[in-house]
Amino acid sequence: SPYPNGLDEKVYLELLKKVILGDFNPEQVVLLEVEPEKQNTKIDFYYAKRDLGIPIVCVTEVSKEKNQLFYRNAQGEKIRIRRIYNRVIFDELHARKDLKLQFSFEDLLDVEWAGHPNWYTRISKFILPYLHGPYFIETTLLSELKSIPDDLENYVLKPLFSFSGAGVVFHVKKE
């Protein structure tokens, strides 16, 4: 099974809902991203919307009143955001000087996080070398590689702290 700890799809989705929704109505929980419709990972967002019932919201569509955040649903109604499933990568956010946000991630906000905004650097590719099992590809940090393999056509290089396919090298050469 591709699900952790031998879970089946139904039990896994129930657990995922508990983790991401917490105690809130799905309409009050948002998947937050920078221009989500333009992201290479948008398929993940659509599945989250389908399976969890949560809206996909761009950071520029969030408004702030005092310490509370809001978005407008498909009917144009203002909905308070109670919990955020954060998909914003701050390297991208800081590089996008054209974005006009009405709040800062550094603000003291009356909102819960389904995963802290900085966790992506800890639970991303960094942990891959430490995961073992039939559903994990063998991964080695380049700095820990003892010798260069002869069959480089079977390898891919991926920068540790990049995102959405940036910097991937498919045709690896010894140079």
Task: Please provide the spans of the model-predicted regions.
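Domain-scale recognition of functional cores that engage charged ligands
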Residues: 2-175
